[in-house]
């Protein structure tokens, strides 16, 4: 819970990101928080903050000006802070159909003022949604992005991002499918303490796609594709054999009933495996009913996905009347990634063994019928149900300032557990104006 009396409200002006960029913010081993964002004039930035010491100087660097000519949030940077301290920022040129992914690497550890020259990767189609992580088991950097709207491709680097493998197509959807892919790096307990896996969920566009099912799987650190229970499939990210993800081999998190659809909202970065989503009905493709979307969290238990009880209603769509598909976006959900109540200890099925240790927290942005709010919800029954913990931010509805996209930085702690966006929302159609907001509880 955030101590609102002690915490200080901080902001990054004119800052935005996208729902499908990863990682958007990372806490480095130096304790600093690094946030990637795009401005409403199309600039690509990385912000460095110290959430521990209020007297520490924050820094901000612009990596590219007028990227793609206008404020397309698809092009926001994904950032990766390597164990070496070097930082990689990757971003795209979505709106103009550019076939390049751009990236820059710091020349000095933890020093955003030393980003080297911009480098490029070329693809066979327009790019968007850069998702970048370090695979510490293989000593590699993994990079995912969507290409030509219907393909997801993977590259890896063995030298900290200096050179890259050829792209591997691992997910394809037919025209109109527009599949979305959301992946999180997870640390596992192992004898050497370095085991990792990459947990993902995929689904189709809520309005355009004909497939309204959320599915899940895992990439092991050796590239092997696993079902959610750990059962290997015959696909490996490293193998140049033409094999791709077979949707029928993945586990179904949520299958929309006839006449309904769903939004994938978050994928948990810690055990137990959890996926956040909101099903709803679109009575008219361009006038979705804001009373119907409801937030849920599904937990993987006993070899299957089990949805929670309804958590709360979303209350509104962010861009009603926009005809590019973004009218079906909601305020959003984010799983907490930190210490204590985040549930970093091994998940236990024993209901009598210290149940409070395994609580998990979700941050939710929504319209409560009167005001736009950012709230936290807690589960103490292993994700079966959630209760309201705290109203973190409240904006009167008549101000027409929306709250959306809560984000928990990778490796976040209680000093800065979450940040969110406030302003006007029109997604990638341009014309949005928003700021990043956060409460920070400094140690000194």
Regions found by a protein language model. Name each.
Residues 1-444:
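Extracellular, repeat-based ectodomains that mediate carbohydrate processing or recognition
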């Amino acid at each position: 819970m955030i101590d609102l009396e002690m915490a200080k409200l901080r902001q990054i002006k004119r800052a935005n990101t996208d729902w499908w960029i990863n990682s958007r913010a990372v806490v480095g081993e130096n304790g600093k928080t690094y946030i990637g964002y795009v401005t409403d004039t199309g600039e690509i930035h990385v912000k460095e903050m110290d959430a521990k010491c209020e007297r520490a100087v924050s820094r901000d660097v612009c990596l590219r000006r007028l990227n793609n000519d206008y404020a397309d949030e698809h092009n926001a940077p994904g950032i990766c802070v390597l164990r070496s301290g070097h930082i990689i920022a990757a971003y795209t040129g979505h709106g103009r159909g550019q076939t390049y992914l751009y990236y820059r690497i710091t020349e000095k550890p933890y020093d955003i003022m030393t980003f080297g020259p911009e480098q490029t990767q070329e693809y066979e189609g327009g790019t968007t949604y850069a998702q970048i992580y370090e695979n510490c088991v293989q000593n590699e950097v993994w990079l995912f992005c969507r290409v030509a709207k219907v393909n997801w491709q993977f590259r890896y680097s063995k030298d900290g991002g200096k050179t890259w493998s050829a792209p591997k197509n691992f997910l394809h959807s037919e025209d109109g499918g527009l599949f979305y892919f959301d992946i999180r790096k997870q640390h596992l307990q192992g004898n050497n303490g370095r085991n990792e896996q990459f947990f993902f969920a995929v689904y189709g566009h809520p309005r355009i796609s004909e497939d309204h099912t959320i599915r899940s799987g895992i990439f092991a650190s050796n590239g092997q594709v696993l079902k959610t229970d750990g059962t290997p499939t015959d696909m490996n990210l490293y193998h140049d054999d033409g094999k791709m993800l077979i949707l029928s081999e993945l586990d179904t998190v949520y299958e929309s009933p006839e006449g309904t659809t769903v939004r994938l909202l978050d994928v948990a970065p810690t055990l137990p495996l959890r996926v956040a989503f909101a099903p709803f009905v679109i009575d008219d493709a361009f006038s979705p009913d804001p009373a119907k979307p409801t937030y849920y969290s599904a937990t993987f238990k006993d070899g299957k996905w089990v949805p929670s009880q309804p958590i709360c209603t979303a209350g509104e769509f962010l861009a009603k009347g926009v005809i590019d598909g973004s009218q079906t976006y909601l305020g959003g959900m984010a799983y907490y990634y930190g210490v204590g109540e985040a549930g970093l200890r091994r998940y236990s099925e024993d209901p009598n063994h210290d149940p409070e240790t395994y609580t998990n927290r979700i941050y939710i942005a929504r319209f409560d019928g009167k005001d736009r709010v950012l709230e936290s919800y807690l589960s103490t029954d292993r994700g079966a149900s959630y209760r309201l913990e705290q109203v973190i931010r409240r904006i009167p509805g008549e101000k027409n300032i929306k709250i959306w996209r809560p984000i928990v930085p990778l490796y976040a702690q209680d000093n800065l557990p979450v940040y969110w966006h406030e302003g006007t929302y029109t997604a990638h159609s341009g014309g949005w104006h928003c700021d990043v907001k956060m409460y920070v509880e400094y140690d000194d």
